[in-house]
C-alpha cells in the first residue's frame, strides 16, 4: 500500500523528497530516501528479498536504487549488503573508511569514502554525514536536503552530538532513535555488560533522552506558523521497549516542558519489520 503522508506542496513548491522505513529496530534496519530522480538506501540490515519487497510496497523498484549509504558496520545495518551488491553490480556504496574496513570483504560494489562534516551530492540530494557516539568504527548519521526540505536520520548513538542537534533543528522530518526504556532495560535478562554498553555514551538513546532532545529541538526550531516538524521514532528494542511505552514517555517529557504532540510536532513510531507509510518531507 502506497500512502503519502504530510504535505506535497510547501509554499508553492512541489516537494519531491520522501522517506520510507523498510525495517527499523535492533534486528535490522533499512530506509528509503528518494526524489523523483534519485533513489537511495540507508543501511541494508535485512535480506535482499525483504529490501526488494519493501521497496515494491513503497512504489520503488530495486533496480532504480543508485546508492547505498551505510551508517556503521554492525550486523543489523549491513546484513544484506553482500546479496544486495551482487544483485545490483552498479550500486555505489558510501561509508566512512572505518566502516569500510569491516564490510569490504562482503561488498562487491564500488566504494566511495565519506567523512563526517563533508557534504556530497547524489543526483539532486545533498547528503550530510555527521558524527555519532556509538561503539563502532567511525559511525555516522545522515541528513538529506533537496529543494530546501531536510530529512535527518539519527539512530545508534549514546547521546546527540552538538553537530547532530544543529541538523535536527533545521529538519522538516526527523527519524530519531528511541531504543529502550531505562527501567525495563535494567530489569531485563541481558548480561550486565550489555546493559552497561546500551546505557553508555556509546550505546543507544533511551525514550527519556529522546524526549528531552525533542524539547531542545522545538526550543530552537525555525519552522513557520503553518508547519510543524514530524518525528518518526526509530530503532526500538524488541526486548526493552514497545511503541506505546516510547510514545507515552516522550509525550510526558514534552508536556512537562509545554510541548504537545499534534500541536507542536507530529509523531509516529516505525515498525521493526513492517514497511512504513511514505512520508513527504
Identify the function of each model-found stretch:
Residues 2-58, 139-156, 173:
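Conserved beta-strand hairpin/beta-sheet module of binuclear metal-dependent hydrolase folds
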Residues 21-30, 71-77, 81, 91-93, ...:
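Structured catalytic core of nucleotide-sugar glycosyltransferases
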Residues 27, 75-78, 100-102, 137, ...:
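Active-site environment of divalent metal-dependent phosphoester hydrolases
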Residues 41-45, 65-73, 94-97, 152-156, ...:
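Active-site neighborhood of phospho(di)ester-bond hydrolases with catalytic His/Asp-centered motifs
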Residues 48-95:
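Active-site metal-binding motif and surrounding structural segment of the metallo-beta-lactamase
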Residues 79-88, 104-106, 241-245:
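Metal-dependent catalytic neighborhoods of phosphoester/phosphodiester hydrolases
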Residues 95-149:
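Metallo-beta-lactamase
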Residues 163-266:
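Cap/insert and terminal regions of metallo-dependent hydrolase folds
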